[in-house]
Amino acid sequence: MKQMLLHLDEVLDFITANNLSFTEGLVKLTSHEIDFKEANMIRSMVKVGAFPHHKELNDFDFEFQSSINEQEIRDFETLRFLEAAENIVFLGSSGVGKTHLATSIGIAAAKKRYSTYFIKCHDLIQQLKKAKLENRLEARLRHFFKYKLLIIDELGYLPIEKNDAKLFFQLIDLRYEKRSTILTTNINFNSWDDVFYDPVIANAILDRILHHAHVINITGKSYRLREYMIQDDE
């Protein structure tokens, strides 16, 4: 009701100026309240997503990263992949924009009120380990399962012990064909055995991730290195 009161005089003037009926005026007045609540809900969904920064696709320099198909990336903003429970994997070396793109898609999903959560792979593993030690692993797995879109950043930057790999597999298996997951990694798929220290687990994880997945292989240069070079020139 607060927004309706704030805009009351404005709407009354609009009704008079445009010779509107009482019902038409009430609809316009109510729309202010609805829009305000919707905006608050969107801000809340984005905040819950725990994104590392607020970067959207329009902030991404597709000209610098020419190995990326811009149309394919922008198609992810339609969120059709979410409805199909498909995954996205951004593969490339450090600094090429993997996290930016993953975050942008996540923000787009949150703005459409899809439950979304961003977490670094190492932090995810630590949470699952802690939950297992405290005999609440099932609850923690259900927590991460509930998100329509889960973004796991920096898979492969740190090695994952065999027992931890089993925990990671349980989550991926739980979400398989039911929820969408976005992963960013700097490790080629044929080297995942080295990350998980177990080829059987590595293959099982890969099988479930890649079965319904869009793989974006980014082969360009580092944005961070470019920014450093620009600053150095200045």
Predicted region positions:
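Conserved lysine of the Walker
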Residues: K98
